[in-house]
Amino acid sequence: MSYYDPIARIYDPWSRSVTEDVEFYVEAALASGGPVVELAVGTGRIAVPIAEAGIRVIGVDLSQRMLDVAREQARERGVEHLVELHHGDLCDPPIHERVPLVICPFRSLLHMAGTGEKLAALRAAHALLEPDGRFVFDVFAPSREDIEETDGRWLEREPGIFERADWDEPGRTLTLSVRSDDVVTSFGLHWLSRPEWDDLLDAGGFEVEEVWGWFDRRPFADEEDMVFSCRRRA
């Protein structure tokens, strides 16, 4: 069972305040012409709007319950014919089609615990791409201020939904816990610095084209958030 299974039904309310990335990834999908593979597709928060823009999406996720929600969302919004969902691992996705764009939104690569796992996921993305295809994803590396403000405190993220961040700065690991009245789960996020991502992407067969500091495409200036656009090398 995935650690996201218990919160599949509250995931969208929990992440309701995160909206800026949706338009960004829809624009990337439209520019690619599709189809698009989304790694860690979750509840379809990104995939369904991409499908509503007329682009076919092939999604993979380790949480069957999140995929169930994604199917419901696609059906309710009339785009189930454009959303193909698979249960599987980001490091070995059960997808055989080659596409012009692979995306991995909402910092999902940080679920990979070590550099070896992250590199395996990057190589899996590389294998899914057409020649000169692009891989677009976002991650973060926390600021000292963010760690100090949130460490070890339960905060109400949305009405009735609480989250707690426990930071292990030397180990560069965030243990994030989410709870509501009847569900609770915890999972780890493992961050890297910008230079470390550059090295991993190079080893994974990618050329970094752009790194932005947010989804409005502001230049990256050693900030917390990193949004990468990378081209597949042959």
Each language-model region and where it sits:
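Conserved class I S-adenosyl-L-methionine
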Residues: 1-42
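Conserved SAM/SAH-binding loop-helix junction
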Residues: 45
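Class I SAM-dependent methyltransferase SAM/SAH-binding core
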Residues: 48-92
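A short acidic, Gly/Pro-enriched loop at the edge of an enzyme's catalytic core
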Residues: 94-101
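A short glycine-rich, Lys/Arg-flanked "PGG" loop and its adjoining helix->strand segment in the class I
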Residues: 119-131
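SAM-dependent methyltransferase
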Residues: 131, 136-199
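C-terminal lobe and adjacent flexible extensions of AdoMet/dcAdoMet transferase-like proteins
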Residues: 194-234
